[in-house]
């Protein structure tokens, strides 16, 4: 629970993020196609997240507060019309894999440097009353990315992102 008035802020020190060895072994999820990056050592497979859960039941993110992704640490060149976000790997905010009865409700999620909410193979998902406020000049800061989910309902959300909103 992120209570009203509270801000859960992602660390600006990349060493603070747990390296998820299971993601490294799988690359990511076998169901997800990863992007290709030219002239970059990064292979497009995120291995660290700010908030991560796998194979859990009843996860709930709620409370009226703010989750802040600290996007500024990923800025590459800032131009008038775009931030290139050339720093890789950028840490996505939330990954839920194969979770059931997942609820994300009445929170504001802002300043994601990459994917904001990535749900992979989840079932019985309720997302409502969520505000996603990403910098519209930051590439790939998708709002909500459901991959192979079942019985998912997204309602009453406001999503501002430079890439896919849903």
What is each residue range found by the language model?
Residues 1-166:
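Extracellular/periplasmic carbohydrate-active domains that bind, remodel
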């Amino acid at each position: 629970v992120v209570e009203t008035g509270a801000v859960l802020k992602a660390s600006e020190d990349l060493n603070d993020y747990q390296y998820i060895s299971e993601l490294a072994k799988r690359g990511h999820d076998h169901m997800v196609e990863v992007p290709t990056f030219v002239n970059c050592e990064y292979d497009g497979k995120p291995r660290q997240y700010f908030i991560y859960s796998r194979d859990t039941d009843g996860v709930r993110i709620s409370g009226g507060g703010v989750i802040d992704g600290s996007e500024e640490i990923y800025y590459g060149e800032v131009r008038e019309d775009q931030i290139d976000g050339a720093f890789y790997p950028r840490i996505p905010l939330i990954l839920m894999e194969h979770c059931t009865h997942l609820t994300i409700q009445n929170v504001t999620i802002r300043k994601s440097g990459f994917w904001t909410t990535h749900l992979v193979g989840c079932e019985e998902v309720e997302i409502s009353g969520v505000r996603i406020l990403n910098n519209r000049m930051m590439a790939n800061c998708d709002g909500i990315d459901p991959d192979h989910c079942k019985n998912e309902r997204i309602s009453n959300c406001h999503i501002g992102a430079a890439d896919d909103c849903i």
